[in-house]
Amino acid sequence: PAGFQRRFMFDDLMARRTARQQPRLYWRGKGVGGSTAVNGQLAIRGVLDAFDEWAAYGATGWSSQDVLPHFIAIEDDLTFGNQPLHGSHGPIPVYRAPLSDWGPVDLALRQAALDAGHPWHDDLNAPDAEGVCTFAMNSRDGRRVSTNDAYLDPARDRPNLVVLGDALVDRVLFEGDAATGVAAILPGGAQDFFAAE
């Protein structure tokens, strides 16, 4: 609905992926938790082989072996958390609806894909998973878990944490290769914020 979009999403944010592409509307969530407060709650990792391609092109620190420990660390995977490629103690719950909870349309689409020869995978986040699956979702007990819920809420009582409303991060600030802060736009003007560590 339009009211939802105006209140919780940036309706004038333009972006492009290449220099030649024309800028297009880029829907992103606004509010504490950003897009995780409004997205589809899918907990789907990037394909590990793609990270290895990035590393082969020079993206140091982005190989599958570099990123996998971070994927594992953030997860609390209710189904596969006890397996080597998943985590069970992170702040982000990962849930997959059992087939018994699927509706008739979902089941019909699943069967059509299987009949067309697409393989079934229990875990779309496994390295070799390609085909039909139950989407992994970041929800717990039927409730969305945003980055606000997972990271900020548990830290709200810390004396070194200040959450500013009506603040828009314009860009991340760097010293060499290290991110040191952010440039933000506040109602009173622009302001830079720097990390202590």
Name each region found by the language model:
Residues 56-179, 185:
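Conserved redox-cofactor binding core of oxidoreductases
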